[in-house]
Amino acid sequence: MANPPHGGVLKDLLARDAPRHDELEIEAEQLPAIVLTERQLCDLELIMNGGFSPLEGFMNQKDYDSVCENVRLADGNLFSMPITLDVSQAVIDDGKLKPGSRVTLRDFRDDRNLAILTIDDIYRPDKAKEAKLVFGGDEEHPAIKYLYNKVQEFYVGGKIEAINKLNHYDYVALRYTPAELRVHFDKLGWNRVVAFQTRNPMHRAHRELTVRAARARQANVLIHPVVGLTKPGDIDHFTRVRAYQALLPRYPNGMAVLGLLGLAMRMGGPREAIWHAIIRKNHGATHFIVGRDHAGPGKNSKGQEFYGPYDAQHAVEKYREELGIEVVEFQQVTYLPDTDEYKPKDEVPAGVKTLDISGTELRNRLRTGAPIPEWFSYPEVVKILRESSPPRHTQGFTIFLTGYMNSGKDAIARALQVTLNQQGGRSVSLLLGDTVRHELSSELGFSREDRHTNIQRIAFVAGELTRAGAAVIASPIAPYEESRNAARDAVTQAGGNFFLVHVATPLEYCEKTDKRGIYAKARRGEIKGFTGVDDPYETPSKADLTVDVSKQTVRSIVHEIILMLETEGFFDRS
């Protein structure tokens, strides 16, 4: 018998509302609609299939405040993460959304109607309170950045009626709903199930710790990786799922199953661990492995962890009775070469030789093509990871040149393009500032918002080209730190490599050598919003390379860039 769902009843809204499907579909076409973002889609899917039981919709203000302040819903049920539907001021100003009215929730990918929400209330969240109580308050936390920069001004709360499932085109057979997974466990005769959450590839150590956890509890294993939204920079879920599938035969026959979870993670540490436990309980698991720094976002700019290493374990243990799922504390295991086995570190006698490979070292080995030993990971898993992580010398990169107009950016960009073409090995694309303005951003002006949009477009193109293995050279003015950081994030999140080169040629030199007289026009007031004259240039705080045309030749600067790329391994050394 699978574990009872959180709150006692599995809120499978898709099954509940199926008899009214046609009626709801017709009504949905007559209602105003909210087109959901990717994160909202992930949340809606788990509301509709019961993964977020006992929720039946997006939280109203009463539930939102209670979850933030008390880690439970207004009715007293334990729940740790605000699940909210945010909308913009413009949507509110439109006047179509009011308490008591109904609104269609629509998929941005295919314009399908997914659900109808009956609005309970519309409220402006206290984002500072949410940031502090839910995520700890550090403004460098990715969830807090998302909250302040991406989440809209208002939340709409209310219960939903489900119309259609989300369409998925990848690994459909592995995307079990809670009800389907419970039926699967029952068919297999599983009564005790240890769930393992991961957003990373699994290696031999993970296999050992999950098998140990299952044996100690006479249980089976649910490998339940997140394939929704995870941490930027994580290995893509297509690669990870292939690796999980390759690993599965390494378990004793009949011990483990693989199921995928379309969750949008918040990287919320202790709060997220409680949330993950609730989700796994709803999927029928009786035990849940909580690791060291579970769902933590890593370190801030000062090198400090956002949470203590065992905060998540302590949080789940605190609510153990209410959760109704047994916490299995993640045991760090290490490899003993003399006996060819893995053991928990606290069980290894003093003086016994051990071996470990850190995540950083693994990434370096994948990047450089260095061998990865079989004691660490299985050959079939390594093969899959290598296919998705080609050697550095075959990867693409973006060189992003920033500086004043007439600082020498374009001359450097053109010379670098020629040099890289001569080098060979990858295609080279040039995105000059004026060219992009003419071809991609001709309708934009030079307000801060329009400048940011222009850089976003450059970054999107650069990210797509870089991901495909090209070398991209971009040379916009890009005067704002926020825009440059967003460009770096866009390229790296697309799977590319990004180098910011600050062309720090002094403004006086740029003006003095301006043969087109553009600075003179700006000084006379004929051009408004001109960088360096009546609009600021924010000096980059994290440039990978700083150069100056007033002190260096273009040739020497290009050579510096080439040396930087060579040092990073972007040219074949064989």
From Swiss-Prot:
Pathway participation: Sulfur metabolism; hydrogen sulfide biosynthesis; sulfite from sulfate: step 1/3
Catalytic activity: sulfate + ATP + H(+) = adenosine 5'-phosphosulfate + diphosphate
GO terms under biological process: cysteine biosynthetic process; hydrogen sulfide biosynthetic process; methionine biosynthetic process; sulfate assimilation via adenylyl sulfate reduction; sulfate assimilation, phosphoadenylyl sulfate reduction by phosphoadenylyl-sulfate reductase (thioredoxin)
Entry GO CC: cytoplasm
Region of interest (N-terminal), ranges: 1-169
UniProt site positions, description: Transition state stabilizer: H203, H206
Highest taxon of source: Eukaryota
Pfam family name, one: PUA_2
Residues that bind 3'-phosphoadenylyl sulfate: D434, T435, V436, R437, R451, I477, A478, R516
Residues annotated as site: Induces change in substrate recognition on ATP binding: F330
Record's function text: Catalyzes the first intracellular reaction of sulfate assimilation, forming adenosine-5'-phosphosulfate (APS) from inorganic sulfate and ATP. Plays an important role in sulfate activation as a component of the biosynthesis pathway of sulfur-containing amino acids.
Protein name, entry field: Sulfate adenylyltransferase
Gene this chain is encoded by: met3
